[in-house]
């Protein structure tokens, strides 16, 4: 039975059950998800703990009677006397199978997360490249505008320079010859 069921049977909160297990270092099994799983023996121990606390015994003075489990060793196998070897083997096989299934699900979930992170990373890299390209385009466009502006300035300066030359040439042509030059024409 899980922690919630044990707490209901004892008439305490789930946190209280968890605290007792941790502080008194009670041997409680855990399922494949890491949650406590209590047997009838565990519930009996927890009931004793509750009774001692109810009678005013401080937590550090609570004594726990742990049932002694005996084992026979036969051909390098350990067999618990309370449970036949076949049932124990079946339970172990079942737990192992559930554990392997859980591990497979965890592995698949991790692979999906990795694939999603890789996809996001590629997308972010594409966005960065796109941004850089847009920035370079803007810079190129600004440079083109500057070049165009400079070309216009150069054209204006060249046309002004031509006009000034033309004006200077016309002035030279229109200037009356000085009297001295007219007297001495060679």
UniProtKB/Swiss-Prot annotation:
SUPFAM superfamilies: Putative DNA-binding domain. Keywords: Cell cycle, Cell division, Chromosome partition, Coiled coil, Cytoplasm, DNA-binding, Sporulation. GO terms for molecular function: double-stranded DNA binding. It is found in: Cytoplasm. GO terms for biological process: asymmetric cell division; chromosome condensation; chromosome segregation; regulation of DNA-templated transcription; sporulation resulting in formation of a cellular spore. It comes from the Bacteria. Residues 90-170 form a coiled coil. Disulfide bonds: none annotated. Residues 160-175 have a biased composition (Basic and acidic residues). Residues 158-186 are annotated as: Disordered. Residues 3-23 bind DNA. Signal peptide: none annotated. One of its GO terms (cellular component) is cytoplasm. NCBIfam families: PRK13182.1-5. HAMAP family: RacA. Belongs to the RacA family. This is Chromosome-anchoring protein RacA.
